[in-house]
Amino acid sequence: MKARDIIKMIEEDGWYIVRQKGSHKQYKHKTKKGLVTIAAHKMSDELALGTLNSIFKQAQIKK
C-alpha cells in the first residue's frame, strides 16, 4: 500500500497532522489516544508490511 493511500485512510478516520519533521508526519485524533507516525520519503513509496501493521495498530484501525 502506498503512503498516500494510508494518509488518506487515517485522515478520513478523523486523524489530523500535528507536526512534521522531514519525512516523518505525526497525526493525532480527537477521541483516540496516542499519535500515528508515518515515515515516507515520497508519497508514492510502498510501505513494508510491518510498517503498515504498526500504523494500523497505532491508529486503532482494523484491516
Language-model segments: which ranges?
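Major-groove DNA-recognition helix of helix-turn-helix-type DNA-binding domains
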Residues: 13, 17-29
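Amphipathic alpha-helical segments
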Residues: 2-14
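C-terminal structural segments of small proteins and small subunits
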Residues: 8, 30-36, 40-63
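Absolute protein N-terminus
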Residues: 1-2, 63
